């Protein structure tokens, strides 16, 4: 499947929650993994790095990895993502710790695009669910963009909070070279999550910001979604809350 077949872009962030706090000694341990999957547009590299830093600070993560594909290096493949997840989970308590996996990329109704060398592969919702299920991590959060509503059904449950920048039938916006954030990434990570450590509150604020921006530019609503995570709220509550983080342009 070629990149031109993908409509708009996708920012997918997966957070497998298996506790790991830095802020509260007795709380859950958190690992944050972020990947920018399309190197031909620098926004995905910038967003992966920025999102990882902000989420890690909010959750008090000890283990933080930001690994994007770039214009000169494209070694983040579907297999590499799976290997990184397994490495992180091997150091965690699978029942009680938190793994956050952030993926930012182009996308389609079939999943997210991964530039593997000269090829473009698709990481599907079922493949992602299989990867996370195979490592045995219980608690997870998924955050994504274009058509990312397709990830809700396979991944959202009481132990998995899924946040998407668009529903299953629409794209999200802001995918272009030489900018730092996509629309949803800017609203959720760079704005709302800097003000609050509450992911649900941050999502609601980000959804309103994105809608206002879409109206201004007369764009078809991306309709961000949130689902699942009933058991995640208590875990995140144990990490405590950091003070407001300064906004970045």
Predicted regions and their residues:
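Extracytoplasmic/secreted proteins, especially bacterial periplasmic and envelope-associated proteins
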Residues: 43-50, 54, 76, 80-87, ...
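A short, glycine/acidic-enriched catalytic loop
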Residues: 105-134
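Short, structured coil segments at secondary-structure junctions
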Residues: 59, 135, 155-159
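Solvent-exposed loop/turn segments at secondary-structure junctions
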Residues: 38-42, 70-74, 105-110, 119, ...
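Structural recognition of the beta-strand scaffold that forms the well-ordered cores
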Residues: 31-34, 64-68, 99-103, 139-144, ...
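Active-site-proximal C-terminal subdomain of hydrolase catalytic domains
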Residues: 140, 145-229
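Boundary/activation segment at the start of structured domains
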Residues: 22-96, 174, 179-182, 236-249
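Disordered regulatory segments flanking catalytic cores
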Residues: 2-32, 41, 217-249
